[in-house]
From Swiss-Prot:
<dbReference type="GO" id="GO:0005886">
    <property type="term" value="C:plasma membrane"/>
</dbReference>
<keyword id="KW-0325">Glycoprotein</keyword>
<dbReference type="GO" id="GO:0002250">
    <property type="term" value="P:adaptive immune response"/>
</dbReference>
<dbReference type="InterPro" id="IPR013106">
    <property type="entry name" value="Ig_V-set"/>
</dbReference>
<dbReference type="InterPro" id="IPR050413">
    <property type="entry name" value="TCR_beta_variable"/>
</dbReference>
<keyword id="KW-1003">Cell membrane</keyword>
<keyword id="KW-0732">Signal</keyword>
<keyword id="KW-0393">Immunoglobulin domain</keyword>
<feature type="glycosylation site" description="N-linked (GlcNAc...) asparagine">
    <location>
        <position position="83"/>
    </location>
</feature>
<dbReference type="InterPro" id="IPR013783">
    <property type="entry name" value="Ig-like_fold"/>
</dbReference>
<dbReference type="InterPro" id="IPR007110">
    <property type="entry name" value="Ig-like_dom"/>
</dbReference>
<keyword id="KW-0675">Receptor</keyword>
<dbReference type="InterPro" id="IPR036179">
    <property type="entry name" value="Ig-like_dom_sf"/>
</dbReference>
<keyword id="KW-0472">Membrane</keyword>
<protein>
    <recommendedName>
        <fullName>T cell receptor beta variable 6-8</fullName>
    </recommendedName>
</protein>
<keyword id="KW-0391">Immunity</keyword>
<keyword id="KW-1015">Disulfide bond</keyword>
Length: 113
């Protein structure tokens, strides 16, 4: 690839600007003491039916915690320590009932058709 073409491609990407991913997860990070509870919020604005919560432990791949195929329905994969609700299409909050050291992880929310 010529240097001129490479510079043109890089310049074009600079003008693209930030893109909304359509899924928002808050808070971005949080530290809890053992026994504390908290709710991780997940919202999507793409009218997707499916929403999922995953966790990724250090050195491991993603593991499904909960999923929902539509508002009003939920199914769990990891049975202990979590609660969810899906009252509408947009929101799928995950509640850690009582934080334990075994729940130290990165939590990720996703949505799809």
């Amino acid at each position: 690839m010529s240097l001129g073409l490479l510079c043109c491609a890089a310049f074009s990407l600079l003008w693209a600007g930030p893109v909304n991913a359509g899924v928002t997860q808050t808070p971005k990070f949080h530290i809890l003491k053992t026994g504390q509870s908290m709710t991780l919020q997940c919202a999507q604005d793409m009218n997707h039916g499916y929403m999922s919560w995953y966790r990724q432990d250090p050195g491991m791949g993603l593991r499904l915690i909960y999923y929902s195929a539509a508002a009003g329905t939920t199914d769990k994969e990891v049975p202990n320590g979590y609660n969810v609700s899906r009252l509408n299409t947009e929101d799928f909050p995950l509640r850690l009932v009582s934080a334990a050291p075994s729940q130290t992880s990165v939590y990720l929310c996703a949505s799809s058709y």
